[in-house]
């Protein structure tokens, strides 16, 4: 609906952790038990949960530390569990990015800390987000306001870094580094819509919440500006087929709806459709109507699921 600098190279910060999580569920089930392990030279850096080598937990618990609490050490542990080596895991991340079509992305770590040659773009983050949204196990974790873990010996509550979760933003991930600024991928399911927003380089204010304010502004503008536009009501005449004996009117059996700008007229006049814009074939049950331009200069293509054929030919 709205984009700005969507192909510009940016630092992904902890949004990187979404790719890390995808690779974990590619290799393990969430109920599997794993043992934490770190490289010998590993030093805790940034936000960490102080996981220790030898600790045992489920994959789900590890994903909670990665996606909810955003712990960097949990990402390093994940890379060791999946690949046995951090650099090999990074190769898997980049291979997965290529497979998904994230052509303006290169990962150089699994946690998102600023690093040379560690970059992505908003469009690539959109691709990554859509892939995460397909995984119900990851979404179930991402949507939790908090989780409890006893890795420190006693039960401790770890809060979700997503401060909009109580406002129906189920996620997907927050981030913050010096290069990325404040960044957030939000998915809001209010008003019978699923709207995904991605903000990057929000100014780091004292409360470190400008990315949430920017997200709410984007969401509000999208709700105010866009809607489902009804192009044809149900049972409205679509096309008339005539020959020397019979005149048959084709009606649509469902409304034709296009999501678009509520301030732009989207109604299409079908009386301009001619024979080279509608295909009739007696041996096929589905046909395309292609209307080159609507009033707002957009190209629409409509696909019939059922199309009646009455003693007509392509020259009629």
Task: Give residue spans per PLM region.
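Active-site-adjacent loops and short helices of periplasmic peptidoglycan-processing enzymes
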Residues: 1-126, 130-136
């Amino acid at each position: 609906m709205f984009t700005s600098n969507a192909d510009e190279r940016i630092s992904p910060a902890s949004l990187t952790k979404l790719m890390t999580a995808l690779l974990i569920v590619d290799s393990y089930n969430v109920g599997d038990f794993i043992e934490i392990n770190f490289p010998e030279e590993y030093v805790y850096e940034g936000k960490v949960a102080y996981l220790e080598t030898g600790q045992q937990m489920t994959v789900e618990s590890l994903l909670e530390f990665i996606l909810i609490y955003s712990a960097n050490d949990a990402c390093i542990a994940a890379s060791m569990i999946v690949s046995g080596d951090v650099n090999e895991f990074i190769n898997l991340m980049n291979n997965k990015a290529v497979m998904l079509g994230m052509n303006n992305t290169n990962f150089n770590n699994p946690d998102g800390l600023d690093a040379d040659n560690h970059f992505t773009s908003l469009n690539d983050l959109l691709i990554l987000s859509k892939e995460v949204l397909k995984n119900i196990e990851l979404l179930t974790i991402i949507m939790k306001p908090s989780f409890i873990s006893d890795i420190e010996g006693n039960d401790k509550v770890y809060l979700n870094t997503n401060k909009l979760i109580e406002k129906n933003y189920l996620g997907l991930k927050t981030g913050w580094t010096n290069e990325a600024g404040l960044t957030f991928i939000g998915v809001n399911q209010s008003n019978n819509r699923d709207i995904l927003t991605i903000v990057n380089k929000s100014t780091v204010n004292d409360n470190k919440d400008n990315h949430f304010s920017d997200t709410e502004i984007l969401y509000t503008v999208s709700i105010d500006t866009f809607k489902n536009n009804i192009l044809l009501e149900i049972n409205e005449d679509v096309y008339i087929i005539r020959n020397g004996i019979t005149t048959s009117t084709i009606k649509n059996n469902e409304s034709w709806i296009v999501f678009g700008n509520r301030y732009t007229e989207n109604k299409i006049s079908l009386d301009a459709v001619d024979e080279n814009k509608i295909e009739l074939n007696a041996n096929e049950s589905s046909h395309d109507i292609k209307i080159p331009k609507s009033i707002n200069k957009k190209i629409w293509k409509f696909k019939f699921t059922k199309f009646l054929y009455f003693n007509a030919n392509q020259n009629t």
